Amino acid sequence: MQWKGAAMARIATFDDWIDYFRQWQKDIGYDPALLGDYNFETKLGELHTGEIEFGDFKGQSKWERIGQIPNQSIRDALMNLIVYQGDTEFASVEQQKNLLDKAPTEYDRQALIRVNSEEMRHGWQMCYLLVNYFGDSGKLEAKKLLERRAFRGDRLLGSFNAPVNNWLDFFTYTEFVDRDGKYQLTMLSHSSFAPLAQSVTAMLKEEFFHMFTGHTGLTRILKAGKIPVPIVQKYFNKWLSTAYDLFGTDHSSSAHWAYVWGLKGRFDEHEAQLPAAKDKLNDLARDHYIAECGKLIDQLNALVPPGEPKLYAPDLKFNRSIGEHVGKRYSVTGELLSEDDYDKHVRDVLPTAEDEKLLNEITKGKDWVAQAQVS
């Protein structure tokens, strides 16, 4: 279901899209006044190199225009990458906007506003590419990016339809889901399509604040010691299991061809010495991510009091919505369970209505999160 007038809207220029963006803000209930003098603009960073870095076209000049791309299959795959990235950005704002009036401190409220403004700008950047480079089909996709809704459950990726109901949700989301974003943007920063590579290089610089917000937020929660560690663990189980899905299916053919065509590289493309294992690109990126998250969790565990259970990342097979483990009844520690045992296990290890009720009680005060260290 679209908002009033949406069906009549037509995107002919980027200015038309900007008008539609303003309507989107209004429709989701996001007051632009909250953003102050934030300037929505397109930003282009530096290319790693002017030459295509990998794949069948390695060594050729990066493509500056769609007409330079050799065939329609490559153009379609490129547009699809941009659409999916843009969809995550607008979805994040829709998921998080309800927390503005629940911020524990003014510092946190301003941090959330900054995160939201940068997510909007990243979506803006992707739509700039769609409208200005991809003709009528790109304009249609840019329009659709503002018509899907996280709270209707029709965003393109499952993580971006999940509810973000409280600030523990938010801090865990920005720690782990935004960290996936770092990986996706890094892989796209090597793209053979120069305008995309330049766009995501600029976006990456802003993404680091989102991850910083998540990690320091979780640090402050553990320092305060008011929210039980087992409840924090449940939110890790919720968001990490869905973040694993964001890397795509195992043995992905689309990732294979994106690499062959130079559209999306490896996370460590700039330092990789060995030829790419093109059938395992998603798996290898996910492995890097899991290793990084493990180190972050180790840092957080230093704040867990003696006698309390240590935090951990759920097993890769738990609660998966895509890939070879989808629909299988694995526990958070990787054991295969019976149907009855699994149903009980899920109730024990993912956030429940009772957990949210307890969190709401705890977070009515201001002492559930330690004071932010502002330099």
PLM feature segments, named:
Residues A111-N132, A202-R220, K238-D245:
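Alpha-helical scaffold segments in carbohydrate-active enzymes
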Residues L99-A103, L188-S189, I221:
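Secondary-structure edge/capping motif, primarily at the C-terminal ends of alpha-helices
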Residues W3-A6, D76-Q85, P104-H122, F170, ...:
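Alpha-helical scaffold segments that form or flank carboxylate-/histidine-based iron centers
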Residues M1-Q110, N132-V164, F247-S375:
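Terminal targeting/low-complexity segments that flank the catalytic cores of oxidoreductases
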Residues G135-F212, I231-L263:
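Active-site-proximal alpha-helical scaffolds that flank and shape metal-associated catalytic sites
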Residues I82, L112, F171, V200, ...:
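Hydrophobic packing residues in well-ordered alpha-helices of helical domains and bundles
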Residues T88-Q96, H122, V177-Q184, H210-G214:
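Amphipathic, well-ordered alpha-helical segments in soluble domains
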Residues F193-A194, L222-P228:
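Glycine-rich cofactor-pocket loops
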